[in-house]
Swiss-Prot record:
Pfam family, one: Slu7
The organism's place on the tree of life at top rank: Eukaryota
Alphabetized InterPro entries for the sequence: Slu7_dom, Splicing_factor_SLU7
Gene, per the UniProt record: slu7
GO cellular component, one term: nuclear speck
Protein name: Pre-mRNA-splicing factor SLU7
Primary subcellular site in the record, as a coarse category: nucleus
Length: 580
């Protein structure tokens, strides 16, 4: 029974051109197929091969190895659809491809070439794309005045690394020119040095130098010829050292090495000014120290050479930027659509125009006030420093023009009038002092603006009878009172209170009477107004008068009270009984 059961399966092979219906597969064939797959997974059977001859991993699931019907109608297992497609791959330029440089000019073609432009003879375009004036007889037939090929640069497709390669397009052969120049310089130096040695040997100077005692002890003579030669060699070396000289580096021309100096300045680093960990914070990323490193030591910023970087925050355009931001906020609150970051140009133009208008308005306002009230002469005065002699400098010069004495500021005068004597006084007020009081020294008077009494005033003011003696003493002030005196004072206080009450009662009665009279008048006026309103409502609208003569003022308290008393209240249940 098992062998007779059929299963629908897809054939392993088929015609690549057409779509075939799935053929029936018996259960025996299905079992053989599964056994073959197991053998392939175990490695006992060779792996399946695709159309390119590549092995298919037997462990790959069927839904991956099977080709969709819209890709390959043959239904043959393959992994081609899982690999990158050639038509979708990006091809980049090779390392040897680069832009053309140093194109030779002046090469002229004298013969027409096959495939060139029939009009001008250039190989880079055709006749329909030629920009030259159409010739009566083209270059194809005449072979005269053949135009050169156009200069076209290749379109390079560079990948991520190719775009960032700093040596891309570099030709190492260009460096040979520099190497040749240095080799020629070295050869010339050696030749020159050999000639000098031969000249010294011929003249005998070299033998004298060797036999000198300074040379025997290993010392060179000062200003010798060899020293000059060495100096000249150093100058030649410095010629090339200048090209390599950079800030922060030392170039040794003898050994041709470069020594990097991490710090070439002689000042103290910020982080070394105060080694306390709780002192000003040093940010190593920005190399900034905003706080004062000497703040813990109790030194003011004026006493130290470095007080932090906070002063930089208020230099440049910082203050003007803050003023512009404040103007933007104020303008936005008043309805102007401006913003410092969104539209800075608009804000700057608006701020400048506002500043000009404000200055013009203040000038016009000042001008109008001066025209109306006057006082321009009080504004045209010299500075206060000149009025009070603040700028007077006394300087003495010698015959030779040097300063002997001077450069001292003039003493500032007091704002009060000085040395002015009044009322026959010979001394000013404040020239005499006694018992905590100021007075005149000429008459010992303690009364300001008084008339001078001379020596007689001195005798009177210096007598033992003083105002203090006439004043009652503390003992008299604190003297105990008798019972009769205390009783009399109480009676006086009671009488005063009774009088105050009577006067207060009479005043309150008068006020109440006045209020009642005012309220009565207001009620009568309200009744008259209501009657007038009823009469006006009975008339036709066209016969009513105008309200142009109506007096508008704030109603008094009595009028408001009368209005409330006479007002109709329809919600009041007792309103119907008011008219009865």
């Amino acid at each position: 029974m098992l062998g007779g059961t059929d299963i629908m399966a897809t054939p392993q092979g088929g015609e690549p051109g057409g779509l075939e219906e799935p053929k029936k597969m018996t259960r025996e064939d299905w079992r053989k197929k599964k056994e073959l797959e197991e053998q392939r997974k175990l490695g006992n059977a060779p792996a399946e091969v695709d159309e390119e001859g590549k092995d298919i991993n037997p462990h790959i699931p069927q839904y991956i190895s099977s080709v969709p019907w819209y890709v390959d109608p043959s239904k043959r297992p393959t992994l081609k659809h899982q690999r990158p497609q050639d038509e979708k791959q990006k091809y980049f330029s090779q390392m040897d491809e680069w832009y053309k440089k140093g194109v030779k000019e002046g090469s002229i073609t004298t013969k027409y070439r096959q495939g060139a432009c029939e009009n001008c003879g250039s190989l880079t375009h055709k006749k329909k794309d030629c920009f030259e004036r159409p010739r009566r007889v083209g270059a194809r037939f005449t072979g005269v005045s053949i135009a050169p090929d156009e200069y076209e640069q290749p379109q390079l497709m560079l990948d991520y690394d190719g775009k960032r390669d700093r040596w891309n397009g570099y030709n190492p052969e260009e460096h040979t020119r520099i190497v040749e120049e240095h080799s020629k310089v070295d050869l010339a130096k050696r030749t020159l040095k050999a000639q000098k040695l031969q000249e010294e040997l011929a003249s005998g100077k070299l033998s004298e130098q060797v036999s000198s005692p300074r040379h025997q002890w290993g010392e060179d003579e000062q200003n010798s010829q060899t020293e000059k030669d060495r100096n000249s060699e150093d100058e030649d070396e410095d010629k090339y050292a200048d090209d390599i000289d950079m800030p922060g580096q030392n170039f040794d021309s003898k050994r041709r090495i470069t020594v990097r100096n991490l710090r070439i300045r002689e000042d103290t680093a910020k982080y070394l000014r105060n080694l306390n960990l709780n002192s000003a914070y040093y940010d190593p990323k920005t190399r900034a120290m905003r706080g004062n490193p000497y703040a813990d030591a109790g030194k003011t910023p004026e006493e130290v050479s470095y007080a932090g970087d906070n002063f930089v925050r208020y230099t440049g355009d910082t203050i003007s930027m803050a003023q512009t931001q404040l103007f933007a906020w104020e303008a936005y609150e008043k309805g102007s659509d401006v913003h410092l970051q969104a539209d800075p140009t608009k804000l700057e133009v608006l701020a400048q125009s506002f500043k000009v208008k404000k200055e013009d308005f203040e000038h016009e306002q000042k001008k109008s006030i001066l025209e109306k009230y006057g006082g321009q002469e009080h504004l045209n005065i010299p500075p206060v420093e000149l009025l009070l002699a603040q700028t007077e400098d006394y300087v003495e010069y010698s015959r030779h023009g040097t300063v002997i004495k001077g450069q001292e500021k003039a003493v500032a005068k007091s704002k009060y009038e000085e040395d002015i004597l009044i009322n026959n006084h010979t001394c000013i007020w404040g020239s005499y002092w006694k018992d905590g009081r100021w007075g005149y020294k000429c008459c010992h008077s303690f009364v300001k603006m008084s008339y001078c009494t001379g020596e007689a005033g001195k005798d009177i003011n210096n007598t033992d009878i003083c105002e203090e003696d006439l004043m009652p003493t503390e003992e008299e002030m604190t003297k105990p009172k008798t019972l009769v005196e205390i009783h009399q004072e109480k009676l006086k206080d009671k009488k005063k209170k009774k009088k105050h009450r009577k006067s207060g009662d009479s005043d309150s009665d008068n006020d109440e009477k006045k209020k009642k009279d005012k309220l009565k008048k207001a009620l009568n006026a309200e009744e008259a107004r209501l009657k007038q309103v009823e009469e006006m409502m009975q008339l036709d609208e066209r016969k009513r008068g105008y309200n142009s003569v109506y007096e508008s003022r704030e109603p008094t308290e009595e009028e408001m009270e009368a209005y409330r008393m006479k007002r109709l209240r329809p919600d009041d249940p007792m309103a119907s009984f008011l008219g009865k």
